[in-house]
C-alpha cells in the first residue's frame, strides 16, 4: 500500500511531473492542429501502396471495407503464398505482420478474419501493412518492390 505525502493530502504518493504534463498538452495541441494534414498524407501513402501492389499482383485481395477504414492501415491477402513466408522473404525491406503481437507465432485463422467470412486459404496469405506520418513515397515504393519481388519468388516456387 502506498500513502501520499502532505502536499498530496495523503491521497497519492509522489509529486506530479509538471513539465511532462505541460509537454503532453502541447503535443496534443500540435497533433490536433495537424490531424487533417496527417490523415491526408497517411491516406495517400496507404492508397499508393495498395494500388501499386494490386497492379503487380494478380488476385490480391483487400480484407475490409474499401472506404470505411483507417487511413494508415492496409490488410491484404496475397494469393497462393503464406503471409509469414512472404514477410520472411521481404524482411530486409519491409517491417509488417501477419497478426497481432500476442498471436505472432499462431498460424490459425484469426477470429476477426473468420468473422468477416474469409476462408483459411485466403487468410493464410493475409498481411497487415501500416504507414506512418513520416513515411515517404520512396519508402512506399521500396516496400511495393520488395513485396512484389517476394510474392513472385514464393508464388513461383510453390
Predicted features and spans:
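Cofactor-pocket helix-loop regions in the catalytic cores of large enzyme subunits
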Residues: 56-59, 72-75
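Hydrophobic C-terminal alpha-helix "anchor/cap" residues
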Residues: 53-54, 90
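PLP-dependent enzyme catalytic core of the Aspartate aminotransferase-like
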Residues: 104, 108-158
